[in-house]
Regions:
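Primarily interfacial, aromatic-capped hydrophobic alpha-helices that serve as membrane anchors
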Residues: 158-201
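Individual transmembrane alpha-helix segments
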Residues: 56-92
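N-terminal signal-anchor transmembrane alpha helix
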Residues: 2-38
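Membrane-interface loop-to-helix entry segments
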Residues: 79-94, 164-176
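Interfacial helix-loop-helix junctions of multi-pass membrane proteins
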Residues: 139-160
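Membrane-interface amphipathic/juxtamembrane segments adjacent to transmembrane helices
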Residues: 32-58
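Cytoplasmic juxtamembrane regions at transmembrane-helix boundaries
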Residues: 94-120, 189-202
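Alpha-helical transmembrane segments of multi-pass membrane proteins
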Residues: 127-134
């Protein structure tokens, strides 16, 4: 496992970045829009009525921000997507792939990897890259709906369902990938126990 320390460090940094976005950046934006959560934090997104309320909250805050000369929630939301949330998805994707790989990596006691475990590893990679696509496209759609320029127009209601599907897809693929990683590590622990000879009686 010593050879894998850069990967574990990357995982720690990824978790730290997620915690910072979820506990610092997102609440700061929510505070400006009456406590409503940004779409990224809702596993099933907003329905049409919820999206209308969120749009109105962003628009109201934008007017207040322009009058007060401060950054609006909408601008902060776009900045989040252009900054931290631009870096996080690829980091999380790499971390998922690494955790799956680490479960199969045993150079000190090489064992044949069963086909089922190899398939599980492949599925983790497929889910991780699907998550990556969903997250990036979700951010782009959300920006086009709640960005400062969009707030001067009517809400694009056709995008509401699209955003919900992308958000649900993001959460579903990441949860399934994590579940498969747990299964791979359980397989690893069971394999190690079976390969360890019983202690000789004294």
């Amino acid at each position: 496992m010593k050879r894998l320390w850069p990967g574990w460090l990357l995982c720690v940094l990824t978790v730290g970045l997620l915690a910072y976005m979820g506990c610092v950046k997102a609440p700061a934006i929510s505070l400006l829009i009456g406590g409503m959560k940004i779409p990224d934090l809702l596993p099933f997104g907003y329905d049409l009525d919820g999206a209308r309320s969120l749009f109105a909250a962003f628009a109201s805050d934008l007017a207040d921000a322009q009058a007060g000369g401060r950054q609006s929630a909408s601008e902060a939301y776009l900045a989040l997507h252009a900054g931290y949330d631009l870096v996080f998805p690829p980091l999380f994707t790499i971390s998922l792939g690494f955790c799956a790989f680490a479960a199969l990596f045993r150079p000190e006691k090489p064992i044949e990897t069963p086909r089922l475990a190899a398939v599980g590893f492949g599925l983790v990679l497929a889910l991780a890259f699907t998550y990556l696509a969903c997250d990036f496209i979700e951010n782009a759609v959300a920006d086009s709906m709640f960005g400062p320029k969009a707030l001067g127009l009517a809400l694009n209601e056709q995008f509401v369902f699209v955003l919900r599907v992308l958000t649900a897809g993001k959460y579903t693929t990441s949860i399934l990938a994590l579940a498969l990683i747990v299964a791979l590590w359980v397989w690893r622990l069971v394999s190690v126990r079976r390969a360890t000879p019983p202690a000789a009686p004294t």
